[in-house]
Amino acid sequence: MVKNIVDLYTRAVASFGETLQHVSLDSWEKRTPCDDWTIQTLVVHVLSGEVQLMNLVEDETYSSPELSPNILGPDPMSTWRGTAINAIRVAQDTPLGKELPHPTVTLTLERLLGARITDNAVHAWDLSQALSLNH
């Protein structure tokens, strides 16, 4: 049973990671259902969202996300796992009502987690479609 939004976030991140495990080295340039996005573009987008969550909570700064493939490093799955684990830890250790800096909206951790849940869940499905997996 899901107790709270942090549990939902953890499950959404895990779902994306489980799907990401199926990406082979020759799959990164495959198209996704997202217009003009490859698997690599999609993974960079989701990964940078988790990095942004940590920046907003820990550093209390908003910066434009890094959308370069370089963010994936030499082992994208290891990069994902480490980033996901750290983002989940930050979410678990931070009060949901904490206000976060953002240039356009009043943002709390709870609202940000709602957005991250949606992003991970939707893009796990997009990724599964690009890989011809059932999701």
Residue ranges with predicted function:
Residues 5-12, 76, 80-83, 112, ...:
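Amphipathic alpha-helix face/heptad-repeat signature
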Residues 1-4, 43-103:
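Short, helix-capping/interhelical loops that line the mouth of catalytic, cofactor-
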